[in-house]
Amino acid sequence: GQIGAMEMIVATAVGGTIYALTSGQPLTILGGTGPMLVFTGMLYELCGLLELPFLSSYAWVGLWTAVFTILCAVTGASTLIRFCTRFTDEVFAVLISLIFISEAVGNLIDTVDAPEVDEYGSLLSLVLAIATFWIAVTLRNTRRSRYLRWWMRQFMADFGSVIAIMAATAVAIWLDVHGLPVLAVPDRFDTTSGRPWLVDLWDLPVWAIFGAALPALLCTVLVFLDHNITNRLVNQSEHRLQKGPGYHLDLLVVGLLTAGLSLFALPWLVAATVRSLNHVRALATIEESVLPDGSTEEHIVSVREQRVTGLAIHILIGLSVLGLPWLKTQGAEIPMAVLYGLFLFMGVTSLAGNQFFERLRLWVMDPHHYPRTHYVRQVPMRDIHRFTAIQLAGLVVLWIVKESALALVFPLFIALLVPLRFGLARSFEARQLESLDS
């Protein structure tokens, strides 16, 4: 409860606006991410074990992380990201999607089983989550519909998730089921716990101030990988972007933002994989082509590269703070089940276009219906399955570490995917790796 919804809204609005104005790749959307949440949770537990105040420790870890991140930016360390290939990018992207899905399903189950929620509230929570997911997915697919005008289909596809939240919340308000868990926000512009906005940096002993540099090194690895891998996914050739990337500038901006956010104990922001890819897709012109087997395949023709949408999104997020007190007095609070449905939507839809996920589907697909992709045509199926199995093993290890007491060193295990990929050169031919991992 020390860092809540209000802190996340403020951090996202301020950080996202600054990033949209100053970054080298404004199509990337900043936000809180699953791996960063895991790291913060483990840092909280570590502070409890050492009997240290969490907010002061959080601030110092953030400040040290900012220093290390800025050093990475000014020394050109982002060039090291060239050693990351599609192998690492895809495993990381699927991990983020699974975190969204597992958090949505797990929290929804906890809500349904909560003793303070009666059977009507449990049933309504389940219905609201499913309805939010279904509406968002349905509206997202209207872009390919034959009905309505083009601009209407485009609007519904781009704002489908917002419409889904509003519709499901309206139903919850209309039914007025008491005891339904809702998003906790203050009645006024204030922190969730009522603490001062500015953190007391000197509430720590000297040894802890310098000791915070150790977890900050791990956090820096996470920020570096999380942000740069997402930027690579945004800049991938399939998106046909015309303007060049700005890895060093982007990392510098994130480092400076981390320092500022840490002073107020606001959530650290990095490139949000799911939101960034959805942002690119919303700005893309997409065409469908018919494959020889009769199936269809989508491909991006162009993307409207600009700063306006990212800037507008975060300004509107900031303005939403002004309406929160009024909405709360009117009883128009967002049920948590609606947000779980949104998380499920974000996790499921972000799997689209991920070749690792598409190759996993081949395991349960009739061989006669395999898609005619380049790797299916050029690589023996046995080797495709072997490559996919290695990626799956890496994903499973990352998940186990995330759920274990080793979660604080979780960033190092993500980094180990890079040498793992280079070790595959001994087991696969170069042309096979070119097809599977180019």
Cite the ranges covered by each PLM segment.
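Transmembrane helical cores of multi-pass ion-transport proteins
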Residues: 1-438
